[in-house]
Amino acid sequence: MVRLLRYGTIFGPLKDRWRYLYKRDLYKRRLEAGPEPERFRSALINWNYDAELYACTHRFGEKLNIESLRNAMTDASFLKQIVKQRTEAGLAATDQTTLAFTHNQELAKQGKQIAEDFLQKALHYWYPKFPQEGIEAITKFLLSESTIADISSGLGFKTLIRCDIPSPRPTMLTNALFAFIGSINENTGRSRAEVFVADFILTHLVGKDINEIWQVKNPMGLLTKVLEENGRQAPESRLIWATGVSSVLSTYVVGVYSNKEFLGKSAGATVSIAEEMAARDALRRLFETDEKRAQIPFDKLYKKGLLLDK
């Protein structure tokens, strides 16, 4: 009865007991062999690189030259690998000048500069009171290798990049995305490249607090500096109220004022923590980056601010 339940009910009819043993043996062999080595996508028989490039241009709605896109997806390591193979084969062409394509370093520089200029312009437009140091910190976050590599991988560039390893490194993914922006600039103009940056890079700020991206180490010092630049008196901290002072759950609420004018307030477990958080709240109010401020309106960005004003 036990055998009948084991082989007859769970794994099919009793006559198919060999099937269970056969599959179990295959499974053990698969575990002993280990994972398959990583292979290039081009090693598979159904790979058509030209078709993939053509599909890429239509996926983003861009009219790009296929050769320009091919260069944008070619990493410098791939070029070195080709030159090395040709040299080992004894061919006369041992330098990249004789090859029909080039790497994406120059396009990547152009694309990164376009993205940086546009992001700073867009952030200045929507956050006019935000300091330049904060704008640069947000731009640096958006153009960081981890952010751009994540965007590039999500856009499907991972299988399009030609490099010397099966899985492109984050640096390769970053260069490919910047080179793609540079290729758009060369083929259809800077305005289309900026639209791409707005659609796929600037939107990375959705759901994020820019006040947390810019790490201010001394908020009270920055608040004092901002008030002095605007001709206002230095900030003054005042304890509004406290509760549970003699317990482990003590709470203090501190307000920040300038010439009896309320700037901000916050709570904290200690007076120093509450004072620091109150200074940060005052900075948010002065820079107009508090929670009441809406996210970047991309419809206004397209119509009024930047992209159509060319």
Feature-to-residue mapping (PLM):
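Double-stranded RNA-binding/processing signature
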Residues: 1-310
